[in-house]
Structure formats: structure tokens, C-alpha cells
């Protein structure tokens, strides 16, 4: 039996892609048709390079997304303003290092609006473009197996915080209902779905630092319940989950043990 090679999803973008993404992010004028052409060409190139490198299960590199989680604000209603920013607990333990990171500007500043209204889909038009670009590139370069990323309800709630729903649980439920169609659309397109769930580990030392590990695990369980609701009816073999403790440069001395968050 051979092992298949794959990766987590997000891959480096070329400068033209970056310029378009941040023009859109900042609300600047840009040519939508040129944007779409740029994304199509960039996805083709990123798939070519994956195939050349021997990757068996390829992705679009999340090329058209400003971020693996906050892209949701552009495709769903209810988000405006700005969410509170909170540095991970391990970086707060080393304030000089945190200050140096901030001054280096190594992490781009993405908009992180709060949920201030009902979360509903604006339609799957942008997702359909992503799917079409990936499948066209796969056909061109002979890749037979592909996957596409989508944010989990929990990670959305981590970065786009709740200012509308009466409880955190109600917000998670609304996000799960809203994301169901996105998940289903990816699977029905013949791609595997990767649900990005850093909330199941990263949020322990980012948002829930006031809780004990045991209390956090209960929060994580509620996130899993919301995710399972959103995935209901999809074949298990077509879904994979990405959990991480954050890919930022830091000491990571506050990461919760894997044994506590994985069954």
C-alpha cells in the first residue's frame, strides 16, 4: 500500500495575486475581470507545481482567499466593524519578542469584522469560480484527486466574533447552518472537503486563556457538535479535518496537549 502525499492547503501567492487580494480587502477600485483572470492563471500554476512536486491530492492553494477563515466575511452577510484582537498567550509571556514581531510587520493585517447581523450566504458564486479553476487546472496537469478548504463554524467564531446572537452556542449554530451549502457544494463537485479547525487547539491559548484545559475541552466539544451538524449527510471518506496550534512564529509554550483535544 502506498501513502498519498498532500498538504494543508494554503500556498504562497505571487505578487499579482497579493495585489488584487489586498486591493479588494481595502475596498480599492480594481478590475473584476482582471482579478478573475489572475486567479485562474495562478491556480493553474500552483496545481502544476504541486503535480511536478509529486503531490497526490492537490488544492487551489486557497489562492483567491485573503485568509483561510476571514474570507467568510466576503461571502456571507452579517459582518461589519472590527473584532477584538488578542495576541496568543505565549507571545504575551515574551513581550519584547511580541513587540519585535509587530514592528517587523511579518503578519498582514486582515479585516476581522464582528458578526452584527444574521449570517446568511450571499450565494456560491465565488466558490464556484474556485472550484472551476481547480478542476480545470487538475484536468490540464493530470491530477485526479483534489481537495478544497473551508472554514469551520468554530474557527469563524474565533476570528469573526459574535456581537449579534444571544449566546456563543446560538452563533455557532447559525454558522453551521450557513456553511452547510458550501461544504456540500465542494463535495458534490467531486473534490474532498478539508474543514479548517484551528479553533480546536489554537483558540485555547488565544481566546479561552481564562479557562482550564478541562473547561476548554467542553468548548471544543461544542464546536465539534456544530461542525457535525454542518457536515450531516456528507460521506465521511470525503471529509478531512485540519487542526493546528497556529502557524505564527512564537515559543508555543502554551499549546494544549494533543492528547487532550484528540479522541
PLM feature spans:
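Domain-level signal for soluble alpha/beta catalytic cores
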Residues: 1-263
Amino acid at each position: 500500500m502506498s501513502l498519498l502525499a498532500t498538504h494543508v492547503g494554503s500556498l504562497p501567492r505571487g505578487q499579482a495575486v497579493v495585489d488584487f487580494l489586498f486591493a479588494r480587502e481595502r475596498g480599492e477600485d480594481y478590475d473584476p475581470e482582471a482579478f478573475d483572470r489572475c486567479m485562474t492563471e495562478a491556480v493553474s500554476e500552483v496545481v502544476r507545481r504541486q503535480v511536478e512536486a509529486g503531490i497526490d491530492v492537490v488544492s487551489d492553494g486557497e489562492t483567491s482567499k485573503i485568509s483561510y477563515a476571514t474570507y467568510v466575511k466576503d461571502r456571507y452577510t452579517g459582518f461589519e466593524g472590527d473584532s477584538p484582537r488578542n495576541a496568543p498567550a505565549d507571545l504575551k509571556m515574551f513581550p519584547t519578542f511580541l513587540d519585535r514581531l509587530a514592528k517587523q510587520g511579518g503578519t498582514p493585517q486582515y479585516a476581522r469584522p464582528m458578526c452584527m447581523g444574521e449570517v446568511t450566504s450571499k450565494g456560491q458564486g465565488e466558490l464556484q469560480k474556485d472550484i472551476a479553476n481547480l478542476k480545470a487546472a487538475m484536468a490540464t496537469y493530470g491530477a485526479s484527486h483534489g481537495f478544497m478548504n473551508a472554514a469551520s463554524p468554530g474557527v469563524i467564531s474565533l476570528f469573526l466574533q459574535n456581537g449579534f446572537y444571544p449566546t456563543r452556542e446560538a452563533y455557532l449554530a447559525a454558522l453551521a447552518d450557513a456553511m452547510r451549502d458550501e461544504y456540500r457544494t465542494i463535495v458534490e463537485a467531486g473534490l474532498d472537503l478539508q474543514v479548517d479547525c484551528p479553533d480546536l487547539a489554537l483558540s485555547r491559548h488565544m481566546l479561552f486563556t481564562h479557562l482550564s484545559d478541562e473547561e476548554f475541552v467542553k468548548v471544543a466539544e461544542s464546536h465539534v457538535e456544530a461542525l457535525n451538524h454542518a457536515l450531516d449527510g456528507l460521506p465521511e471518506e470525503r471529509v478531512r479535518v485540519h487542526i493546528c496550534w497556529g502557524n505564527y512564529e512564537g515559543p508555543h509554550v502554551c499549546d494544549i496537549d494533543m492528547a487532550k483535544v484528540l479522541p
